[in-house]
């Protein structure tokens, strides 16, 4: 079977809600990375066979936001492009679709990833198309409803985390401790240049003066403590334990990479970072969607012909501390190998981009001692996706 490799994997800094990227559309964040990847590899843009980009909150952006990103990023109009929505798994699903298209011989080079600007998601007035006869009307927050609400139970993703708290007996202190550790690991990595190789700075033009250049993730908090987090009120249930401090943020960002056949990479003298070994997807009861990575990880390992003990590093999306703790318990993961640079609780969770973001961060950790990695994300609606990669040799 054709070996599929990953190269030129990058991400933008991750912006906080209403932060530096509040006026930068998702497709502009994506375009920044596309332009950088083309320039860095020296690849002729016309040689890219297809572009596949995850994006969840698409309302108001225009037709096919991935196409907008590709064209603004310098790709010719002849390159076909489509947008993927698998909620939090969108970015990684895009890479899986690229992988599948190469294995089947349809493509040799695909640019894949994800992008999201949650700050720009619009408010909607449903049923207003033909006017209202009388009475009050309300707006729907497209970010909350299309991105963060379980439609089957009509409640916020945070309640699915509270459901896992009850099922697994996870304490508030455990969650807050997990969140603090994520922040500390991310702060340490940020201070010591641990993200420098994966981040492409984003230049934001200003009406007056020089552009603002964003180079670092905005959500990392160096001085957080369990004591400080313990003062936060529950966010989703009156007597709950999930808070804004032990959950991932609402964020803006993008992540992209080249997915190629090994033969094409050799032909073009592009040095791969890793080989894609296999993927796994899984579904569970939507009310406990956060536990779905367990099944996805097991399937990805089986398809990759690997055991959990073969994995040197894990990048698992931290939707909620409770969700992460439940998955860690089920899989019995070694904590020293999981999210060694922190996770989404610290870095942020731009939902359409996160699947690609966790893989980008993983790829930049591979070396002679860390040769095999696994990444996974839970997905709203009761799903998960996972991937296994190995350092290219």
From Swiss-Prot:
InterPro entries named among the record's database cross-references: Thiolase, Thiolase-like, Thiolase_acyl_enz_int_AS, Thiolase_AS, Thiolase_C, Thiolase_CS, Thiolase_N
Molecular function GO terms recorded: acetyl-CoA C-acetyltransferase activity
Location relative to the cell: Cytoplasm
One Pfam family per UniProt: Thiolase_N
Spans through the membrane: none
Keywords for the protein's UniProt record, in alphabetical order: Acyltransferase, Cytoplasm, Transferase
GO cellular component: cytoplasm
EC code: 2.3.1.9
UniProt entry tagged with the keyword Transferase: yes
Active site: 88 (acyl-thioester intermediate), 349 (proton acceptor), 378 (proton acceptor)
Class of enzymatic activity (EC top level): transferase
Highest taxon, organism lineage: Bacteria
Substrates-to-products reaction catalysed: 2 acetyl-CoA = acetoacetyl-CoA + CoA
Membership in a protein family: Belongs to the thiolase-like superfamily. Thiolase family.
PANTHER family per UniProt: ACETYL-COA ACETYLTRANSFERASE, CYTOSOLIC, ACETYL-COA C-ACYLTRANSFERASE
Name the record gives this protein: Probable acetyl-CoA acyltransferase
The organism of origin for this protein: Staphylococcus aureus (strain bovine RF122 / ET3-1)
């Amino acid at each position: 079977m054709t070996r599929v490799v990953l190269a030129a994997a990058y991400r933008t800094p991750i912006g906080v809600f209403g932060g530096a990227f509040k006026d930068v559309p998702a497709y502009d964040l994506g375009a920044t990375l596309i332009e950088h990847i083309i320039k860095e590899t020296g690849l002729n843009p016309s040689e890219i066979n297809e572009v596949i980009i995850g994006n969840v909150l698409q309302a108001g952006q225009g037709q096919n936001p991935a196409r907008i990103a590709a064209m603004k990023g310098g790709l010719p109009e002849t390159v076909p492009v489509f947008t993927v929505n698998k909620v939090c798994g969108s970015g990684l699903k895009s890479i899986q679709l690229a992988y599948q298209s190469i294995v089947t011989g349809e493509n040799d080079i695909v640019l894949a990833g994800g992008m999201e600007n949650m700050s720009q998601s619009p408010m909607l007035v449903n049923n207003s198309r033909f006017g209202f006869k009388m009475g009050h009307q309300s707006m729907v927050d497209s970010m909350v409803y299309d991105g963060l609400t379980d439609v089957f139970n009509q409640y916020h993703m945070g309640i699915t985390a509270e459901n896992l708290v009850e099922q697994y007996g996870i304490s508030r202190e455990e969650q807050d401790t997990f969140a603090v550790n994520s922040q500390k690991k991310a702060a340490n990595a940020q201070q010591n240049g641990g993200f420098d190789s994966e981040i492409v700075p984003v230049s934001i033009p200003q009406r007056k003066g020089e552009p603002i250049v964003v180079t670092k993730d905005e959500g990392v908090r160096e001085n957080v403590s369990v004591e400080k987090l313990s003062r936060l009120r529950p966010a989703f249930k009156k007597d709950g334990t999930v808070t804004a401090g032990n959950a991932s943020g609402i964020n803006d960002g993008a992540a992209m990479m080249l997915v190629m056949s090994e033969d094409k990479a050799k032909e073009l003298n592009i040095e791969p970072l890793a080989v894609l070994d296999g993927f796994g997807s899984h579904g569970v009861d939507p009310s406990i969607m956060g536990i779905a990575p367990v099944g996805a990880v097991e399937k990805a390992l089986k398809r990759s012909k690997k055991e959990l003990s073969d994995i040197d590093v894990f990048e698992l999306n931290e939707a909620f501390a409770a969700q992460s703790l439940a998955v860690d318990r089920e899989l019995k993961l070694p904590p020293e190998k999981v999210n060694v640079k922190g996770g989404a609780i610290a870095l942020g969770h731009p939902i359409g981009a996160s699947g690609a973001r966790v893989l980008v961060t993983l790829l930049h950790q591979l070396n002679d001692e860390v040769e095999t990695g696994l990444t996974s994300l839970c997905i709203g609606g009761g799903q998960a996706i996972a991937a296994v990669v190995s350092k290219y040799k």
